[in-house]
Amino acid sequence: MASGAVADHQIEAVSGKRVAVVGAGVSGLAAAYKLKSRGLNVTVFEADGRVGGKLRSVMQNGLIWDEGANTMTEAEPEVGSLLDDLGLREKQQFPISQKKRYIVRNGVPVMLPTNPIELVTSSVLSTQSKFQILLEPFLWKKKSSKVSDASAEESVSEFFQRHFGQEVVDYLIDPFVGGTSAADPDSLSMKHSFPDLWNVEKSFGSIIVGAIRTKFAAKGGKSRDTKSSPGTKKGSRGSFSFKGGMQILPDTLCKSLSHDEINLDSKVLSLSYNSGSRQENWSLSCVSHNETQRQNPHYDAVIMTAPLCNVKEMKVMKGGQPFQLNFLPEINYMPLSVLITTFTKEKVKRPLEGFGVLIPSKEQKHGFKTLGTLFSSMMFPDRSPSDVHLYTTFIGGSRNQELAKASTDELKQVVTSDLQRLLGVEGEPVSVNHYYWRKAFPLYDSSYDSVMEAIDKMENDLPGFFYAGNHRGGLSVGKSIASGCKAADLVISYLESCSNDKKPNDSL
């Protein structure tokens, strides 16, 4: 009873407050949805003419494909709660044979092992590397192991090389980070790219032991806390999309907001904070593609989800004086091209069932130029006609930044060549669609501490300003959703504190 009364009081304290959310990707939309559900007035500003950010689904000529993220997971609790609240469980779509994933080794796709027995018999790794993996729990006991210095900038490559050897880095870690962040293990900072594993090593020494114990602890918590949740069982099934593509998620979030609460084609040019009162201290101006500039109503708080490279271009005022953003560091972004191709089934001589195939950097010596390919119609048979295979191939990233910028015709030849080696495709694809992401992902490199410090400085120096998105906390869809939800919680706490500061002291 007491906790319920407190919750009611908190809702009453923030109800009706006005919050501006800049950016209508999943971070911004998740934040806006959570704020609105708590009774706040929300306005979302999006520079593009659509919502979704890096989630883009296309339906065309009987095909459905994604030009950004193709799947997501439910590793973050905020994701499951959001799916339940939005009623999206019935639209979830789980890939067929998603455990069948492949890595190229010596020019040939090899299925990744999913358990220790499969690891022993797999040809992905040498016998020496297999033993190193199996012995890691015994070799890396907490008391006798030298773990990473908390202040050290260890790369992903160095971290996994210490635990499992160089071959594991070359043939497992390298293709994985290439496929998930378009980066390479030498460039990525371990503590920013894999913070959970970074912390697991601190606690357990062995990351295998730590991962297993953490997983079982999480399962135990879920069994106690979410027994009645309809999505608990489904949430354990790994990667998923939605019927109609990933765009369904932002579109559904958008529908939860009114027309007046979503401003598309609204690029924010400036923000201004004035500390004259404890409410509605923020104002912002934006411009549309036809150069129409407008000043918007005042707000009590701002959640910024735009990329930091765009934030640097904004004019920020504080108390009538310019608030310089020159402390924001330059961020490296990975360029990426996505090529969607179709082949008639009779032209694919060695089709593979499963999720997809990733290509290690070392396999470039065999002529491969792409990062990997998703077997889109194998995962989701309703994404193409029954006589057609649909493939989604990724090109570029840190491995080949110039190739990412190539023309559609050039990339078609590159992709067709790789698919010929991998799957035995013959001839030209029936259809080709190309989308180029100039800045697909921020690179969590060795200097990323300075980025996090800059974000903290903005939030500390600008009352009521909060940052969310894939520049903080992770690149995945789930991490981005969690980031937006956490920013919404911080806004609510901030507004509650402002409300409490305004109240007279009524203690006896």
From Swiss-Prot:
InterPro entries: Amino_oxidase, FAD/NAD-bd_sf, Protoporphyrinogen_oxidase, Zeta_carotene_desat/Oxidored. It is found in: Plastid, Chloroplast; Mitochondrion. Keywords: Chlorophyll biosynthesis, Chloroplast, FAD, Flavoprotein, Heme biosynthesis, Mitochondrion, Oxidoreductase, Plastid, Porphyrin biosynthesis, Transit peptide. Residues 1-22 form a transit peptide. GO terms for biological process: chlorophyll biosynthetic process; embryo development ending in seed dormancy; protoporphyrinogen IX biosynthetic process. FAD binds at residues 23-28, 46-47, 68-71, 268, 475-477. This is Protoporphyrinogen oxidase 2, chloroplastic/mitochondrial. The gene is PPOX2.
